[in-house]
A protein has these predicted regions:
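Assembly/oligomerization scaffold segments
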Residues: 37-38
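Residue-level signal for pocket-adjacent positions within structured domains
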Residues: 16, 32, 84, 105, ...
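Acidic, glycine-rich catalytic/binding loops that coordinate metals and/or anionic ligands
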Residues: 1-11, 16, 41-43, 96-102, ...
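Zn2+-dependent peptidoglycan hydrolase active-site motif and core
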Residues: 22-23, 30-33, 46, 51-94, ...
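A structural signal for short beta-strand/turn segments enriched in small hydrophobics and glycine
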Residues: 49, 55-57, 98-110
Length: 189
């Protein structure tokens, strides 16, 4: 069984991969379209879920009893332009469309809404915010973890990037002789 430690895990604790991208079988119409994370070891059974990227929320789907993937939130990744979809959350995401997220942002709580065999996070990754089989990508590749059922994923919170500092407002320089600043402006051209 493989074990990896990453700083952008959706579960800030230990988890185990219970199904992986590309698997086939009776549970899926064509193939498994995401990576399934379940709590492992001392991690609570319904842990908070966190963004795996810096990005923006583009969709929040509330489970009404008919969606196979239950409560969902979709985030567009700033670094790739691709989309992450978190599925089966126990309640609708606390986020709204347009909210900015980082790897320190809680996106929801692991659950079992929709078609499930037990509580887990089904995490999808794709090139569009609407999903079709030709737009899916392997989430394990994007996270840098093995695409293997039974892989244990450890979260290393010590390497979470800090929240970005707000841009300081540009300070207006003052000089006892204002013409000096005016002259410098032209000298630097």
């Amino acid at each position: 069984m493989a074990e990896v430690t990453i700083n952008n895990s959706p579960i800030h604790g230990d988890s185990i991969l219970t199904a992986v991208y590309g698997e086939t079988g009776p549970n899926w119409s064509r193939f498994h379209t995401g990576t399934d994370f379940a709590p492992y070891g001392s991690t609570p059974s319904n842990p908070d879920l966190y963004s795996v990227c810096t990005g923006v929320v583009v969709n929040v789907i509330t489970y009404t009893g008919t969606q196979a993937l239950g409560n969902q939130v979709v985030i567009q990744d700033d670094s790739t332009g691709n989309f992450w979809r978190y599925c089966h959350m126990n309640a609708p995401s606390p986020l709204s469309i347009g909210d900015r997220v980082t790897t320190a942002t809680k996106v929801g709580v692991l659950g079992s809404t929709g078609n499930v065999t037990g509580p887990h996070l089904h995490l999808e990754y794709g090139t569009t915010s609407y999903w079709s089989y030709d737009t899916f990508l392997n989430p394990s590749d994007a996270l840098g973890i093995p695409n293997a059922r039974g892989t244990i994923v450890h979260y290393d919170g010590s390497v979470v990037p800090p929240e970005p500092e707000p841009e300081p407002e540009q300070e207006i320089k003052k000089h006892k002789f204002p013409w000096v600043l005016y002259a410098r402006k032209f000298r630097n051209r």
